[in-house]
Amino acid sequence: MIVVFYYTQSGQALDVAKRICQPLAEAGTEVVWRPIIPQQTYPFPWNKYEFFDSFPETRLGMPPSGIQPLDFSGIEKAELVMIVGQSWFLSPSLPLQSFFENEQVKAYLEGKKVVFVNACRNMWLMTGRAVKAYLHEIKACQVGHIVLQDTAPNLISALTIVRWLLYGKKQSSWLLPAAGVRKADIEDASRFGDIIKIAIEKNDFQHLQPQLLAAGAIDYKPSILLLEKTGHRMFGHWAHFIRKRGGFRDPRRRTRVNIFFYYLLVVLFVVSPFAQLFFYLTYPLHCVGKHKREDCYIESNN
């Protein structure tokens, strides 16, 4: 049995999970689905202000509410748990954070083998690190990490994701491609399910992550991840700056949230292109191979 806990707004994360699990279901493995439903509702498409107002709590790991009760009956002896979600503001989404902080979830995941699947734009590193820390704290055993990401250039994907998040327009239009993970990439995600199926059959999860990586489970883009690491640090300062004016949905912090929005526009469309150019000019100095091993592989003692 494999249990899939998932959070999705647009349906993309669920599409990814279904495709990964298809080979398992076809082989006779029981796949049990459990949606993660936050007590605090998050709209989709988003209102612009509400989306950016959720930033400080997302970055600081302070979800404003918990999740609806989950049904754990009949899944106690699952051979594998898959957790599927997405990144918000270079961190796990607030519903994912609420999920990991739930006491029943902690008790259930203790000792379980876990694969984390992230369907995101193109910055997944800090989310992966946060999830890894959550799982380590509750004594779960992370055996896999899969990232399906938007393959469009960074600035293009920023435009398409805003169009999708705020206006609900996923389809290609004018000169912009469709937003999100490409349909072909979602369809091809079944190859990860084939690898997971063999691991379950052999009860051998020690080599699962290297096998997933060999199949393309993570497309490692060092210049983007350098931007992410820098952005994550700066986001921490901004999150504290905004929260000094109030907590989640406090109208007193509206001005600071709006300032952050314009700061983000400048970073995305002015600063980041030059930062990427600088990275490529200094590429030999960045020890990319070492960082890739640290960022993509999972220690066997997790």
Each predicted region: which residue ranges?
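A polyampholytic, Gly/Pro-enriched intrinsically disordered region
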Residues: 55-58, 133-141, 161-174
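Short, surface-exposed basic-aromatic patches at helix termini and helix-loop junctions that form
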Residues: 22, 97-111, 129-140
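Glycine-rich phosphate/pyrophosphate-binding loop and the adjoining helix
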Residues: 153-230
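Short, glycine-/small-residue-rich phosphate/pyrophosphate-handling segment
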Residues: 113-153
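A short acidic, often aromatic-flanked loop/helix-cap motif at beta-alpha or helix-coil junctions
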Residues: 39-43, 150-155
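N-terminal beta1-alpha1-beta2 submodule of the flavodoxin-like/Rossmannoid cofactor-binding fold
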Residues: 1-85, 90-95, 101, 109-110, ...
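A short secondary-structure junction signal
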Residues: 94-95, 126-129, 157
